[in-house]
Amino acid sequence: KEIKVGVLKFGTANWELKTTMDNGIDTKHNFKLNVVGLADKKANIAAFLGGEVDVILTDYIWVSRQRTEGADFVFIPHSKSVGGIIVSPSSNISSLNDLAGKKIGIAGGPVDKSWVILQAYAKSVHNLDVKKDVELVFGAPPLINEKLMSGEIDAVLNFWHWNARLKAKGMTELHSVANMLDEMGLNSNAPLLGWAFRESWANENDELIRSFLDSSFETKGMLLNDMNAWENLKAKMKADKDESLFKNLSTDYRAGIMTESSPSAAEAAKKTFAVMAEIGGQKLVGSSATLDAGTFWSAY
């Protein structure tokens, strides 16, 4: 039986899916993995809503929001990789308070999850209102990276794999989003991204979805524990000619791997969701300020 999985064409989830297929892990679990590469987030969601794919990679906030509106989507954790703030070593910025009056580039727009967490963290831990005290420059990930390298801006808040590229060029991480969550007393083990699918479809295709999820966690174990598994991915990672970049990307990816779907991960997500709802509001989470109870699929 075949399962169609929708992911962003150039997204990092392809590293896992390629490893699954290269090692015949899908065949071992008696199914055929069909990866459908999509242009962007909107195309990914449209393919899922239109029934062109069975499973997509998305965040649990979107799944909860859809459930609040009546959908029967459920979520299984994939990754807890989040971004962070990167600065130039020559910037004289050694703490968050040093950002006051400076220019920071932000990827992903005004309701990006890392940006929402940064606002909550700055307010609760540093009494800093980043919206007022810091000059904000929103832009696409490669663009804000370029602006940091050229000295046009003082810091960036970017996605983890774009940050890995900056670190490979000698830039330093001031603060990771994972550390921010920890310092706010939230569990940084909360998964951000995961596999989403319809619960009704899962009930009808119980063996297929379990085989896919088993193969996904088996592949994660391989990427976590066997560095040889990464050799085949260098070209896909666009790091075949840059050992420093390869090292940064593989290390940071492995740090974000979720090895299981557990009640503690769901609990951590619930607490993080409440903070995001408080700062991001309806634009981010929709009409409910609490995580929908059935978001995490408890049948697996």
Regions found by a protein language model. Give the residues of each.
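Short, glycine-/small- and polar/acidic-enriched structural segments
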Residues: K1-F138, D154-W160, L174-V177
